[in-house]
């Protein structure tokens, strides 16, 4: 009688994810919602003239990188604040390039804006996003206004061990 050990490794995650949304977004910088309406609509899936599209842009970039967007955690993925439930929370002192940052917008408590952190310049954060002055561009934001910072962390591999006894190997 022999004992055979079987090990199954299950990798769960975003295969092929680059995790650098700033590089992924480069070809879209400068696109304007009216002038480039068709291109933006095809990429983000909404009409940028009729819909606030910052969250759609972030979701489209994440999807292009093989990363699940806010639709994986929210029934309202087109709302910037849906990203407050996405990924893992990050403290401002630990912010890194590519982290998703959510800011308030307007006076309504449900409104917001979302984009990707690029770097710090002085006392401001450089944020790359869609629907910033009606286009894809870099803008400076006050970090004290951030509602939340989130980061995608790929799931780790899980390992299952099982034992098969009384295996006849003849």
Features from the language model and the residues they span:
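Active-site signature of cysteine proteases
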Residues: 124, 128-156
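...with weaker cross-activation on analogous glycine-rich loops/strands in unrelated enzymes
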Residues: 22-23, 68-137
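Extracytoplasmic/periplasmic, Sec-exported soluble proteins
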Residues: 17, 46-54, 90-93, 107-109, ...
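N-terminal capping segments
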Residues: 13-71, 153, 161-170
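General structural signal for secondary-structure boundaries
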Residues: 17, 36-39, 73-82, 91, ...
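Sec-dependent N-terminal signal peptides
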Residues: 3-13
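Structural motif marking the loop-to-transmembrane transition
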Residues: 1-4, 50
């Amino acid at each position: 009688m022999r004992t055979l050990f079987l090990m199954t490794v299950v990798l769960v995650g975003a295969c092929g994810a680059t995790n650098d949304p700033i590089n992924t977004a480069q070809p879209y910088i400068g696109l304007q919602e009216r002038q480039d309406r068709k291109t933006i609509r095809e990429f983000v899936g909404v009409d940028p003239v009729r819909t606030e599209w910052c969250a759609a842009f972030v979701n489209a970039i994440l999807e292009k990188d093989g990363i699940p967007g806010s639709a994986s955690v929210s029934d309202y993925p087109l709302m910037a604040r849906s990203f407050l439930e996405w990924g893992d929370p990050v403290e401002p002192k630990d912010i890194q390039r590519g982290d998703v940052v959510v800011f308030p917008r307007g006076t309504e408590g449900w409104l917001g804006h979302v984009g990707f952190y690029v770097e710090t310049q002085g006392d401001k954060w450089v944020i790359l996003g869609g629907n910033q002055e009606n286009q894809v561009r870099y803008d400076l934001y006050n970090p004290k206004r951030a509602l939340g910072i989130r980061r995608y962390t790929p799931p780790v591999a899980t390992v299952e061990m099982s034992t098969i006894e009384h295996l006849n190997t003849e």
